[in-house]
From Swiss-Prot:
It comes from Emericella nidulans (strain FGSC A4 / ATCC 38163 / CBS 112.46 / NRRL 194 / M139) (Aspergillus nidulans). Residues 135-489 are annotated as: Adenylation. Belongs to the ATP-dependent AMP-binding enzyme family. The modification O-(pantetheine 4'-phosphoryl)serine is found at residue 631. One of its GO terms (molecular function) is CoA-ligase activity. The gene is tdiA. Keywords: Phosphopantetheine, Phosphoprotein, Transferase. PANTHER family: BCDNA.GH02901 (PTHR24096:SF422), LONG-CHAIN-FATTY-ACID--COA LIGASE (PTHR24096). This is Didemethylasterriquinone D synthetase tdiA.
Amino acid sequence: MAPSKTEIAPLRAAKYPFGNIVDALRHAAAHTDEGIIVYHPNSISTSSPPQTVSYKDLLHQAEANATRLLQQKLCSPKSIVLVHFESALDSIVWYWSVLLAGGIPALTGPGMFSQNPADRERHLRHLSETLNSPVCLTRPALLAPFEEQTADDRIKARTVDEILAAPEIADVADAPLPALTPSSTDMLALMLTSGSSGNAKAVPLTHQQLLAAFRGKSTAASLRFPRSPFLSWVHMDHVANLVHCHIFAIVSGISQIQVPAPDLLINPAQLLNLISRHRVSRTFMPNFLCAKLRRQLESGSPEYILDPGLNLETLYIDTGGEANVTEVCIALQSLLSRYGAPDNVFKPSFGMTETVAGCIFNSHCPSYDHAQRHEFACLGKPMPGVRMRVTRLDTPSEEAAPGERGSLEVTGEVVFKGYYNNPAATAEAFTSDGWFRTGDLAFIDSNGNLHLDGRTKEMININGVKYLPYELDAALEQAQIPGATPSYFCTFSSRDATMDTEVVVVLYLPSYVESDDEARFSTQSSIIRVVAMHTRSRPRVVPLRPQDMPKSTLGKLSRAKLKTALEEGQFATQQQINDEAIRRYQQKTRASPETPDEAVILDIIKEQLEIRSDDDSFGVNDSILSIGATSMDLVAIIHRINKCLQPSQPLRLTDILKDSTARGLAVALATGAAPRSQDQSSTHVYDPVVTLQPHGTKSPLWLVHPGVGEVLVFVNLAHHITDRPVYAFRAKGFNAAAGLPETPFTSLEELFTTYRDAIKERQPHGPYAIAGYSFGGMVAFEVSKLLEQDGDEVRYCGSWNLPPHIKFRMRELVWEECVIHLFYFVGLMTELAAYTHKPTLQEFNRANRRLDAIRYLRQHCDAARWDELGLSEEYYLLWVGLASNMQSLAVDYEPSGSVKCMDVFVADPLSHVAKDRIDWVEGRLSAWKEFVREDVRFHDVQGAHYTMLNREYVEAFAGTLKNVLRERGL
């Protein structure tokens, strides 16, 4: 085939003074004082300096670790080792440790795991087979998915904590690390192309390939300040960080800044502050982040404070991963220019793992795209070391004409040569003459610039994160949404220039009467909640007619045909009818902000949940919990409200659980700011019920808190229950923190009858469904008994990992034990770490210095998590007191009587209670049979006693719960 006009001649750039990246690190360590500047979570705007690790220190630490890996036989020459961490610094240190030990690091992170347990198992099995049963290095907090493996041939996970704690072998401890001199064709890393669906491909990266890429990237960029550092917030399992920032900086002999992604994604203006403080010469900012930064700067909000004297003269913005809207680039260029940013600061690029990140660059954005009136910025021309071509769709052996859409292919010394241990995928990925098929549709304009024009794959790309349409279809099906016809969901992505990123489109066949606006609104709201839960984005929802959604003879909907029909306007009438009906219903039911505080709070909620500011489908009376907000969203919303409005009495997390609407939070602010009158205090009535999910037509689910008394643990679970309301009980006494006369329960009988009465007030008639987590399991049992004594039917009584006989455990939970359990339960420290402080806590307690005990423990907990929760030391003291009081009520509790049926959810037991699940069930949980008249069933769930509702397990837990409710006729 004749070469394309856009091909670039082979690389002829000067060589580096080393031939591999190991020597590059040695060179940087020996000849520079540069290194890694690490920002820990929530530390950008604090006075504490970031952590600095010089390349010299990195080399020494990695060499020491490499020696340990060899001593403990965890790494051998050319063996593959998974480097699996959340922290960038952990990933960096252990990447080099494996490499210096002669192994091949394969970098992964917790983000590779699906919430579906079957997908996780399948993914790990696939990795084990592909990577030849590798060892995995990780931290204790990340072990859970590896411990779930059931296959015989599984990945063996080891924590680096164990490795570093192991004694050195005496006769080899002083032996020097074998000298490592890799050849240019040796692998330096394996990077995964995908991960959540079990079909990951491993891309080998070689020393020769990376050095060629760095020469090309440097030539294409021609940085004005080449000695200034790089900055990355991307996880280290992506080439955009490992290669394009971390190793590139080392090879270039310059420093690098590593920042946690959440800090910048919540507040992109901080990225500008870091660029100015460190005179950063190169960083990455995809379109969705550019758009968010633009909105911040244009808003002029005092929440987004820029450093005085902000200077962006060194700036060079790599942008890619999704199409860049030209209008966003133009607007942001103007804003950044005020602070010295150079013209054409944006460098839209095309890159993949297989091409070592960006390899085709547009160096004239936005000026070129503005002049050409491009809706989306072009991707420019290949850098040295890469050639590109577009081949015709109908005749792949022929090159497409300028402007003609075809298949994008690339080749060159930067491009990988094949997938690791996957000859079939390699054969499919390359043409007969050795060009790599990217899987993208594209065209090259008359000036030789690349433009992407769709994808051959159906992957949905939201804010740079990819989702599989069939997974969203399945989630909608599993939600059993009233008003939607089963098996008639079709999801895909769509986008126009008004959007920052792609949007999920959901087409569905309604089962309600077309004139029923309320049913239409309820159905659409449920669909939005399900999609938001999975993608953190708000979908475009279009109900269609039966004739619009024909099925094939195999019962399938054609995603491609439906997407084409939508984009061609064939469903415009249905969209208009739906929009008018939704608007009509909202006008009847929605309320607008009535005070400045309500308006501000509503804006904060919308921004946090990524709801467009002009989208009036969410109002001041709508619950944050009803649209898929996670527990971390609640924390962020409270933090942002307090920071923006600076009330005299800051909102607490408990306020949002009490009333999760913008209006309710505004009332809480006003109430907290005003002095508490005697009349207000005297009229306070304790309400134990928190509404976690108000929607659905089936019998409500009632959830009883664990021993800590709070309901935050149920928030993520409630998002997965979309077919029925979900209510949770919150213990009595928390409102005392707000100065209200609310005292804790004085007896179990008071607790039981209070919760029974609250259920009857909101749900006068059965059948009832009630479950309790840990301590709450006992309460659920007793409340169910009271309901049955009144003649009501309880079809589901659930005990989540609690046996009937608990008084001995309750007697063990003295005050210091309650402190330890609370701090572990809310994520302030690990259980192991918390127990090391037990003797000191006992001393404080004996001296009646309980507040000092809380202050002491605070010094040893996760400071970032403490700030996230936003609670005071006095509040934790109150909370511990409530938990201790409540559990002390049960020190003489003896179960008696019976309920008709019970379902016991079984998680891993506490280590000091039972040795394993079999022992736990046979020795303790099976005793429930004595207190159930007809039917007690046991259901295994993933995770342990304190983690079974964690994010990685909650979807599977919800699936089990839904099945149980269905089996019980609910």
